[in-house]
Amino acid sequence: MVNKFLYPRGGSESYMLYLAEYLKKIGHEIEYFGMYDENNTVGNSKGLYTKNMDFHSKGLARFLYPFKIIYSFEAKKKIMQVIDDFKPDIVHMNNINFQLTPSIIYGIKKKKIPLVQTVHDYQMICPNHLLYNFDKNIPCEKCVKGSHMNCIKNKCIHGSGVKSVIGAIEAKLYSWIETYKKVDLYICPSYFLENKLLSAKGYYKGKTKTIHNFINKEKFSNNQRKEEDYIAFIGRFSKEKGIENLAGAAKLLPQYNFIAAGSGPDEGMLKGIENIRLTGFLTGDRLTELMGNAKVMILPSVWYENCPISILEAHCMGVPVMAMNSGGMAELIKDGVTGTLIDDPSPEGIALKLRETLENEEYYINLRENCKKEKDNILSVEDYAEILIKEYQKLIAR
């Protein structure tokens, strides 16, 4: 298993660690490769990792990072050494850019090992990984088939000209030399993402498979739901997550209570609104309880969400979800059956759909009951692994 971070940090790490733990449980041998960090919870028997890259450091190392995050000779060399020692049947990559770089693909394929990658974002077709223009607060696909100069012009990466130049160079380089063509199979968590890859480059054809994300179904199915009168938002407080529009909708609906769990740069937009309570960043049982007891959960994301696990978790607990009719969200919610899809992302559009959903009691009760049935269609880690292993076996047998 390959990922730049080897400890629980975000969604891709949680996915990798949980999946790998289950694969080990059923008899598979697994080793890991990534960046060294004192927080690492997994590793490899050779003890080989790339050096930790602190992008906030000062001095000479900082000036060398632009070169290292485009192509890493260190990462390529070390992953080949790990492969020589462990002799895997297959390599499964997750997030590799910047800290590991796509250079490792060349090292892996030099060893003639089948290579799979789970695609957690739009990195291969968009320099900022999100298909999103932060300045205009709208989805953006200008680099998908157009020039990567758009990334530089719009300062798409953290609003930084330097970072955007580096990101554009990296994207252009690996697109030009067709590095991603060398991967044998791409696991896509949504059909939306799969279709974006296929429309971007012809060489992805025949190399993609959509498998929706899995969750710990036992944990969420056993939740004792005690419905309370609030609308839940769980996520990062930032523009692309639709925080500004959520704040506006709450102001238009003073009769409804909102609870927002998370943190982020735009938290100020939610402060001072009387019917919004902020809990801070929550994890574990507190987060599950907040989600499970909500009247509905809302995802007002402006960017194209891939396959939000929170939607799967909410449905498993019988909580209807309201989300934008875009990206992978539209695949997970059956409009009018397990939730409501919102076409108009404005505060007025969100407020209208909330009223329509919550003020029609019969409609709302049907949503809730349908969600309870929907959990049978959600993948567990056992279901997911069964599908994945079959794909592994096909590649190994070639």
Regions found by a protein language model. Name each.
Residues 192, 214:
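Carbohydrate-associated surface elements
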Residues 187, 224-241, 247-251, 259:
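Conserved donor-binding/catalytic core segment of Leloir-type glycosyltransferases
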Residues 280, 335-336, 340-347, 356-362:
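Conserved acidic donor-binding segment of nucleotide-sugar-dependent glycosyltransferases
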Residues 3-9, 21-73, 77-85, 264:
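N-terminal strand-loop element at the rim of the active site
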Residues 320-323:
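Short hydrophobic beta-strand element within catalytic cores of glycosyltransferases
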Residues 110, 123, 138-186:
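Membrane-proximal helix-turn-helix segments that form the acceptor-binding/catalytic region
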Residues 268-289:
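Nucleotide-activated donor-binding/catalytic signature segment of Leloir-type glycosyltransferases, i.e.
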Residues 349, 356, 363-378, 384-390:
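A short, well-ordered alpha-helix in the C-terminal region of glycosyltransferases
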